[in-house]
Design a protein with these regions (language model features):
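Interhelical loop and helix-boundary elements at the membrane-water interface
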Residues: 1-16, 23-316
Length: 316
């Protein structure tokens, strides 16, 4: 079976198209908010979208015909089911707002900024966000990594190991794990992308639909986003897109990928939270980074890498 086939090409096109949409948003954001928007960072995000699309067909270790069914299911979830569910949620929000127009006034961008500022006490020139905000951020960043680990362990040790389902479906536990991870991951990436499309619709003079975001999503954003990220693409999207290259490069060595993934989430979180809570010695002196944070991050990263390689790599 060819790598690029009727089941994989739609996902490739879907992600490259989203990359082009992100490029358009980046150009408009640079034009409208030149001081606030980080344009080089946005270009890197666009490149990650293109990379995720182009590399999608290479996830599976075999081109066996048995894999085709799982590629079909994955494509349906990523390109059809997930977008359809998002449309249904937004349609429900729209109907809800039509019945109660006061909701639209309450969900305006100005109100969001005002509530954010009220919750962001203690932010200084060297302290760009509070400990509580960073805790919410790191928890949100950890969520994709936790989902990936759970799906992989289920596929390899339960679906294949305990149930011996590979004998029925003709697909190894590792390939089934890849199917679960990329289906959930690529679908999740698009969900966060739609959140960005709506959140950053302020680039349009008449097409700002920020008000259609549900209240619980706005509350989560208010808790987890940095002030300087208001006019940038949201972090979880970038994080999951950045997982694509190491996941492919570490194919057959999931422990290596897991170590890198957990260092990027838990290790970075330990460094950041320790620095915010206990940091007293900035390095460099004009930076919000601290020596205490560096040390905690290094120790945490080493411990995480050791545990990931010991429990995940040696057991395969």
């Amino acid at each position: 079976m060819d790598t690029y086939n009727i089941f994989t090409i739609p996902v490739v096109i879907f992600f490259i198209t989203n990359g082009l949409v992100h490029l358009y948003y980046a150009l408009r954001l640079r034009q409208k908010f030149p001081e606030e928007h980080n344009f080089p960072k946005s270009l890197a995000v666009v490149a990650l979208w293109f990379n995720a699309g182009i590399m999608y067909p290479f996830f599976y270790s075999t081109g066996d015909g048995n894999v085709a069914f799982f590629q079909l299911v994955s494509m349906l979830f990523i390109c059809i089911i997930t977008p359809a569910l998002i449309v249904l949620v937004l349609a429900y929000q729209y109907m809800k707002i039509r019945e109660n127009p006061e909701i639209k006034k309450r969900r305006c961008l100005a109100t969001f900024f005002k509530q954010y500022e009220e919750k962001s006490g203690g932010v200084t020139a060297l302290k760009t966000h509070t400990f509580k905000t960073d805790l919410h951020r790191k928890t949100l960043h950890l969520f994709p990594a936790a989902v990936i680990l759970i799906l992989w362990l289920f596929a390899v040790h339960i679906w294949d190991g305990m149930w011996n389902s590979s004998a029925i479906w003709g697909v190894s536990g590792q390939d089934f794990g890849v199917f679960l991870i990329i289906t959930a991951g690529y679908s999740g990436i698009f969900v966060f992308a739609c959140l960005d499309y709506i959140r950053l619709s302020c680039i349009y003079d008449r097409g700002n639909v920020f008000w259609i975001l549900p209240d619980n999503v706005l509350n989560l954003l208010g808790k987890a986003i940095k002030h300087k990220e208001f006019y940038e693409f949201i972090g979880p999207t970038i994080l999951v897109l950045a997982f694509v290259p190491p996941f492919i490069l570490a194919h057959g060595a999931f422990g290596v990928f897991a170590a890198a993934m957990l260092i990027a989430t838990i290790g970075d979180g330990v460094a950041s939270l320790t620095g915010l809570k206990f940091g007293k010695h900035s390095f460099p002196k004009d930076s919000h980074k601290t020596i205490e944070g560096y040390v905690a991050g290094a120790i945490g990263s080493f411990a995480i890498a050791f545990l990931a390689l010991f429990f995940l790599e040696s057991k395969q």
